[in-house]
From Swiss-Prot:
The gene is fhs. It comes from Shewanella pealeana (strain ATCC 700345 / ANG-SQ1). The keyword Signal does not apply. Its EC number is 6.3.4.3. The keyword ATP-binding applies. ATP binds at residues 65-72. HAMAP family: FTHFS. One of its GO terms (biological process) is tetrahydrofolate interconversion. GO terms for molecular function: ATP binding; formate-tetrahydrofolate ligase activity. It catalyses: (6S)-5,6,7,8-tetrahydrofolate + formate + ATP = (6R)-10-formyltetrahydrofolate + ADP + phosphate. InterPro entries: Formate_THF_ligase, P-loop_NTPase. Keywords: ATP-binding, Ligase, Nucleotide-binding, One-carbon metabolism. This is Formate--tetrahydrofolate ligase. NCBIfam families: PRK13505.1, PRK13506.1. Belongs to the formate--tetrahydrofolate ligase family.
Amino acid sequence: MHSDIEISRQHTCLPITDIANNLGLEPDELSLCGANKAKISLSVAKRLADRENAKLVIVTAVTPTPFGEGKTVTTIGLTQAMNLNGIKACACIRQPSMGPVFGTKGGAAGGGYAQVVPMEELNLHLTGDIHAVSSAHNLAAAAIDARLFHETRLGAEAFTQESGLTALNIDAENILWRRVVDHNERSLRQIKVGFGAVNGPVHESGFDITAASELMAILALSQDLKDLRQRIGRLVLALNNQGEPITAETLGVAGAMTVIMADAIEPTLMQTLSGDPCFIHAGPFANIAHGNSSIIADTIAAKLADVVVTEAGFGSDMGFEKFSNIKVRESGYAPSASVVVVTLKALKANSGIESDQDINQPDTQRLKVGFANLEWHINNVSQYGVPVVVAINRFPTDTDEELEWLKQAIEQTKAFGSEISEAFGKGAEGATKLADMVYRATQTPSDFNLLYESNTSLESKLMTLAEVGYGASSVTLSDKAKSQLNWLAKHNYGELPICVAKTPMSISHDPDIKGIPTGFELPITELRLNAGAGFVTALVGKVMTMPGLGIKPGYLNVDINDDGEIVGLA
């Protein structure tokens, strides 16, 4: 079988104007970005406001493994198959970050014959939204440091006289706004800036990956341009010497930041290998951010299609939990069905049983022990009141016997049902049975509910997430987190939802604990306010908001030939 990029390159794309026309978009609602991409105007949702929303399907998975479970493959394959079955479907996915593209994970266009094309355009730059987020974010960092420099240089009174601005009295030890870059760069996690006589007071800072920027979350959670502007204004960049928040609005930089991101608020339309529509918009990671594509993309797709298929990052304890308790809480657009993706490899890897045997070979013991992880995720999604369909993503090495055992085992769970998907190797034709089952699930009663109410305390929300969301017995807070919790309560941020940043490789905080961890304490090391996005991030265990490159990163395989064709992109 050809590589993903070879399959993408061998395919002749339809004009993106044809994709838009088939979806029901008007010519003046498109801003073309070459032949294969178009920005979509937010006016679409207004034009079709009276139209009933499509059924929403959310794709999640079991606890991730290094082998990959195939959420995006399933999301795209399901969309392709629904359209083949005569159901008008549209996919909504996140924009890939170049950090993972050149790191270990690779791109995020799907794979095989279930991918968004051209995959190299999707995985590299797309329409520049991530760059806009980076630029707007780093403008705020430059602005707060410049203000600190001038106020320190002149003193508060002289600064006000010379500038006509009120001194903010920034506490250099409490500048909360870090910088971002769209690459994995561990050496920038903790830095000091301001060295040199004319470069401002020295203070600690650091870089996060752009996908972890609060601006990326704001882009994903905003309803329109006005909402984007208001949210950016609420960003808390630093504290003053009295411990009070200094916002982007107070600093006077919110308007300029919004201008940089004005085009980024429009979703990008591309197509699958079958010529089906796919919106790509926003790219927050699910382990260190809220892990879902934008509300705006969903809102537009909901007025154009009969079914919208979107995905949440990593396992259901990560992206799906945040989809439910953060994204749906904001949008009010609840799912009618969910899909939990699983592979035989994932179950064996999640068994926690050490074995020298090739994981591609039959192994009944590991499969049966690892099944508990799948059942946990089925139960986890079910508690939100959404029908669960299990998509068994088939690999060529899978045996019929193990697949049949798995299907029978799933029949004894709370799942609506299960189907084997071969979308990777067969495209739409490989997922028609799955598409039929998922569509039937969307037609059954769904009683979606949130895990906690907004009016409960942050401490109560943390306990609920720990105990009900992860199976922990208790929560422990570091001294730093306790102090931050008190500050948040004092400044009336207690009703915000929680975004837990933790390892995705275990339901717990420890990536080495497989299966279904129980009886553990969830250690909260830090609480970060995201006043603009509208949530509080709780950092758990040893999680990092800036990844690092591995010993053999993906960029080693990437090059360009004499004809200008990219090679080695995964």
